[in-house]
Each structure stands twice: as C-alpha cells, then as structure tokens.
C-alpha cells in the first residue's frame, strides 16, 4: 500500500485505531498489533488528567505505540465546548509530548454528533497554538471545507454516529467531500461496523479509516483487527486499480458471437 | 512456623482464617500429627473495618454468566465453582452473612434490544450447559413484579446469586478474633492493623534449594519501624502491590494496575426487587443488588484510572439515571453512600498467583473478588501445603487459575 500522509509523516498503515472498550489491555495490545495500525487514539477526559490518574494505562498504550513505531493521537472525547476541548488539548500535549490531536467536540448527547460551531472555534485556536489538528466532524461539505481552510490538513468526517456500527449512512456526501477536497487527507471516522464498510470508503478514495468499537466489541477483537487490515488493503488497491464503470447493459466477458444485439426483445 | 499475610481485605482474611484453623493441611491425620504450630501475622494498612479495601466497595454479585460478556470463560468456571464452595465456607462462620442463589435478571430497553439479543446468542453459543430463561413481559412481571412494569422482556439466569460483601468482612474479622482466643490447633494470629509494610526482602541461604529461604518484612507501626522474619509470606495487597504504591524492595508487581470503580448505596424502601438486576446498555454497565431492608447497591463504573477521589458528577448521573430507568421508585431513594475505590488488575484482567521460594503473591482479582475467592483460596492453601511439606502436589485449579513461578525478583 502507498503511504498515508498525516501532517508530513508517512505511515505504512491506513488504519487508525482506538484504545477503548477492549476486554482487557492485553487484548487491546494484541488487536493493535494484528491491525498493523501505527496511530492509536486515546482519551483522557475521564482519567482526571490534572492528577494524571490514568498513567498506568497511558504508559501501557505508549509501549504498544513504541513497539509498532507509531504515533499516539490523544483525543478530546467528552468535551462539549471549544473552551473545554482547548484546555484538555493543552493538558494532553503536556502529558504525551505530541502536538497531534483528534479534536472532538460533541453537540448532542443522544447521537454524539459533533458541534460544528464549537469545533471550528476550537480548531482555529488550537492551530494558532501549534497543534496538528485532526477534527472529527459530520459529513457536511461546507464544514469540511472550512476546517481545511483553517489549516486542518487532515479532516475526519463520520460514517455514522460513534459506536453505532451503521456503516456509511450517506455515501453521496462522503463522495462529494472526497471530490471537492482532493488535496486533504480524508480519514473516515466513527460508525464503521464491518470490514466491508471500511473497504467501501477506501474504494471511494478515502485516505484512511479510524475505528474502535468495530474491533473492540467483536467476539474476537484480534481476528477482527486482521480482517480490517485486509479490508483496507483491498479497498486501497481497488481505488488505485480504478473501479470499472457501472453499465445498464450486460457485457459478456466471453464474447457470444451467435447472439447479435438486434435479437433482444426490448 | 511463622507466616505473614500482607493485606487484610477479602483474600487476606480468608487465608488468615484458614491458616488459623490449619486448613492448609488437607489430611486430617497429618493435621493432628503436625506438632509444629503456626504463628500468623496479618499486616494491613487499613483499620480492621477494611473500608479502604476493594471488597468493601463491591456489590458481592455471584453472577458468572452476567459477567461472561466481559471476561474469559475460566472466570465463569471459577464463578460457578465458587458458588458451590461459598455455602460451606459461610456455614463455618458464627456471624450470619447473606448468601442468595435465586437467580439474576438481565433487562434492556427497547432501543438497546440488539445488545440484549447479542448477549443471549453469546450465552447459548458459549455456555449451553447453563440454564437460561427468556421471559416475556408477563413472566417478568410474575418473577419481579416491579421490574416488569418498565420492560417488555428479560432474561432469567437461575443459577446466579449474591453475597453480603460487607457483612462477610465483619464476620471474618469476628471469627478471626474468636478463634484466635479459643484455638484448638495451637496456631496463633497477630493482627497488625494500621500498619504500613515497607519492605518484603528475601534471604536465600541456598540458591538451589529455596526451602530454607526466609523473608524479612519491614513495617511502620505506631510510628516505629520494625522488622520481622518469616518462613512464608502471602501477599494479598491488591492495589497496594502496584509499582506506584509499592517500593522496589517491597515486591511490587510490575504488570498490576488500578482500575477505578464507583457505586452507590441507596435506601429505597418503596422499591421491591428481590434478586440482582443488570441493565444492558451500550454506554453503561449497571447492576442493582438488593441488600435487604430496603438497601440497594447500584454500580459500577469501570475507569482506567488509579484515582480514588470521591465519585464524579458524571458517574453519579450515569449510574442514577440508569437505575431510575430500571425502577422509577429510585427517584425517592436516599443516597446513603457513594463509594469510589480501585480494583487491582493485570493487563489481561485475569487473576494470578505467583510464587517463588517463601513468597506467594495473590492478586489481580479485578471486579471478580467475591465471584472467585473460594477457588483462589483453595489454590493458595494447596501452595502453602506444598511449601510447608516440601512437596510438589498438583494444585486443584491449575486449569482455571494462572499459578506460576515468579519470573523476576524486583528486590
């Protein structure tokens, strides 16, 4: 596979993976290794970051990231305002010594839909402060365009709400974003349920996939991580290979010379 | 023989009582012929009420199938075996402790039916030998009339149960004190509470044969630093043995971590639920454990953090709103207590017994302390027996419970 470009860093794997919801840290580690992913997200909102109470699990995740020669991608999950997200982002930069940030600002409790206004506001402040922002957003073209104009080189629209596993709810929107932002690194984030969902997005030309629940909540997370790795590779290769155009008329792959077209009834 | 037990939580108390009774010597004749009495010293940084132990901040659920979606099958097997062992153990105590095995109920709201159906499929595929009954609304109403009002269906797991966790800690304390006064075995217990162990150091006389090895425990008690030598040390410290909480020369377990859990104790005399209820929800894991006379334990969060500060508003809102959605009667309940405590877990969330020479370490019981304690106790006693008699007999639960030689000594 070709390299994935995240703010100038070339990565071998196009899968970005979350570190929550696994049956145990050990299963998480094995699943990350099986996925081949080199970017691991982690949240710190609930771990009392001011006291660094999540040190043990953070250290564990950092060790896995080091093992795969990868990058840690702290996120601001659970934040509802730009102010809250900016504060948490600064804490995470201090703790993890990285200016990469998955920016997440939630606007609705029920479907955990990102708040576009607070998101733009936070992204602007964080970019000025030197962060490399990877914003998690809805599949709204104009919002993605605005984030890109602000300086977000990576944009992460959702496939569907977090943890639903509903797959690509609006392929038209997602394709439009890809066509209209050809130079942005587009990562499809949230809502992926099956490897075929990830493959579909890669076939559309998305640069990568970020997921968590689809692997962590599988009956066998390690095997599912492998399945996603294969699906991404298949989708990426299909995109590069160029998918054939759909047609209305059947076209036999073996020529049937004895069936001229004027023999058709309609 | 001098034996030290470090940590007087659930495991520490169970091991202490068994050693005081001489239970480690499985053969009765051997026990009678054993002339050498045992002096047990029980060290604990807490007072005897054990309010800082993970066992105090638990609900005492004995629900192996209810836990099965979040744990490995060996924990489920140990859970069922422990359900079999608990009654005998409790019968040997003078103080009454609640032990109930009238089943547990799982429910889910209509919008989360997918999780509910997945759980049923999981049980049928992985645990076909255990009984489960899917209940219609009418059947649920009959079994738990006040739960049936809010749910259209439920799952009844008839073999599940619960134990009075806090009463058991008290009962074990009283039993230890009583049997120490009137012991027939000649064994003695010295319980040093509010005592901080600061060193567990080994002294190996013979590198090849470690049976001669002794351990010296250094501790702070009443402001004084003291040292004492033991033939055997059984470490039951729980989160006290993490690298963060335990110094280098105090046998820390490097792979051990703390996982924060929070729960409520509610007084809800208007709520009448007779058996443990779990709510299946995509975001929260909620259980309600009825503890008699109108008391309920509602828990529990699971946060990857070693913070034991008081419960957060977010956790409180999650737990209470989920409880309210199960039974609106909880709206008028009194919050009697909110508890936060850390549970000890290894990176695979499995319990582990490690041993090397004169040190046995029992840890990583995570959220399954009461669920598996009797099995862990038997395994520890078998190890002690091997150590005392210099034998290498098979251990009873090696198929389920990881029991291994400690690889590296930190000291």
Task: State what each model feature region is.
Chain B
Residues 4-6, 43, 228-240, 377:
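Short hydrophobic core segments
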Residues 14, 18, 61-62, 66, ...:
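Active-site substrate-recognition segment that forms the wall
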Residues 20-55:
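Glycine-rich FAD pyrophosphate-binding loop
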Residues 59-143:
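Dinucleotide-binding Rossmann-like beta1-alpha1 core, especially the glycine-rich loop
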Residues 70, 74-80, 107-115, 155-174, ...:
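Short beta-strand to alpha-helix junction loop
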Residues 96-109, 121-122, 131-175, 301-305, ...:
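Helix-loop-beta segment of a Rossmann-like dinucleotide-binding subdomain
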Residues 154-203, 207, 219, 236:
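Helical element adjacent to the flavin cofactor pocket in flavoenzyme catalytic cores
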Residues 333-411:
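C-terminal catalytic lobe of FAD-dependent flavoproteins
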């Amino acid at each position: 596979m070709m390299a994935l470009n995240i703010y100038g860093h070339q990565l071998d794997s196009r899968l970005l993976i979350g570190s929550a919801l696994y049956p145990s840290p050990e299963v998480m580690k094995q699943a990350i290794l099986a996925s081949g992913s080199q970017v691991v997200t982690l949240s710190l909102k609930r771990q009392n970051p001011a006291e660094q109470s999540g040190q043990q699990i953070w250290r564990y995740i950092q060790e896995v990231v080091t093992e795969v020669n990868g990058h840690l991608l702290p996120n601001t999950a659970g934040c509802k305002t730009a102010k809250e997200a900016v504060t948490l982002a600064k804490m995470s930069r201090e703790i993890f010594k990285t200016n990469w940030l998955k920016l997440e600002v939630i606007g609705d409790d029920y479907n955990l839909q990102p708040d576009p206004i607070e998101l733009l506001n936070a992204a602007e402040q964080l970019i000025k402060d030197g962060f490399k922002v990877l914003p998690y957003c809805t599949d709204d073209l104009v919002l993605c365009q605005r984030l890109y104009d602000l300086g977000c080189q990576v944009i992460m629209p959702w496939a569907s709400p977090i943890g639903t596993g509903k797959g690509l709810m609006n392929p038209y929107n997602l394709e439009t974003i890809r066509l209209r932002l050809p130079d942005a690194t587009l990562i499809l984030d949230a809502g992926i349920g099956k490897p075929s969902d990830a493959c579909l997005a890669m076939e559309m030309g998305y640069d990568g996939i970020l997921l968590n629940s689809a692997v962590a909540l599988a009956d066998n997370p390690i095997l599912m991580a492998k399945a996603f790795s294969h699906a991404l590779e298949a989708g990426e290769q299909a995109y590069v290979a160029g998918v054939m155009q759909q047609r209305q008329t059947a076209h036999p792959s073996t020529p049937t010379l004895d069936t001229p077209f004027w023999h058709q009834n309609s | 023989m001098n034996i030290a037990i470090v940590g007087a939580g659930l495991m520490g108390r169970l091991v202490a009582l068994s050693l005081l009774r001489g239970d480690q010597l499985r053969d009765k004749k051997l026990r009678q012929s054993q002339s050498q009495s045992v002096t047990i010293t029980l060290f604990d940084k807490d007072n005897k009420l054990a309010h800082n132990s993970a066992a105090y901040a638990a609900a005492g659920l004995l629900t192996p199938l209810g836990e099965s979606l979040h744990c490995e099958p060996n924990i489920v097997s140990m859970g069922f075996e422990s359900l079999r062992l608990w009654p005998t153990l409790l019968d040997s105590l003078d103080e009454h402790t609640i032990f109930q095995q009238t089943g547990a109920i799982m429910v889910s709201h209509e919008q989360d039916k997918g999780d509910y159906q997945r759980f049923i499929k999981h049980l049928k595929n992985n645990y076909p030998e255990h009984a489960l009954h899917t209940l219609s609304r009418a059947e649920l109403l009959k079994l738990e009339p006040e739960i049936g009002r809010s749910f259209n269906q439920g799952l009844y797991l008839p073999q599940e149960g619960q134990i009075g966790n806090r009463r058991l800690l008290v009962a074990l304390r009283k039993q230890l004190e009583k049997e120490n006064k009137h012991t027939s075995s000649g064994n003695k217990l010295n319980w040093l509470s509010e005592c901080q162990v600061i060193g567990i150091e080994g002294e190996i006389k013979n590198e090849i044969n470690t049976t001669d090895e002794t351990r010296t425990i250094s501790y702070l008690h009443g402001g004084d630093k003291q040292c004492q030598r033991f033939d055997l040390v059984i470490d039951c410290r729980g989160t006290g043995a993490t690298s963060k909480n335990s110094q280098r020369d105090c046998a820390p377990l490097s792979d051990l971590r703390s996982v924060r859990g929070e729960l409520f104790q509610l007084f809800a005399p208007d709520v009448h639920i007779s058996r443990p209820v779990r709510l299946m929800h995509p975001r929260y894991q909620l259980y309600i454990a009825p503890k008699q006379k109108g008391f309920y334990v509602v828990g529990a969060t699971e946060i990857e953090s070693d913070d034991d500060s008081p419960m957060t508003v977010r956790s409180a809102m999650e737990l209470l709103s989920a409880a309210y959605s199960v039974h609106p009667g909880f709206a008028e309940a009194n919050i009697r207590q909110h508890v936060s405590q850390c549970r000890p877990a290894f990176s695979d969330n499995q319990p582990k017994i490690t041993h090397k020479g004169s040190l046995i370490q029992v840890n990583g019981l995570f959220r399954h302390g009461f669920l598996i304690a009797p099995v862990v106790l038997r395994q520890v006693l078998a190890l002690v027996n091997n150590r005392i008699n210099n034998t290498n007999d098979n251990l009873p639960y090696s198929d389920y419970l990881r029991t291994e030689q400690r690889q590296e000594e930190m000291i």
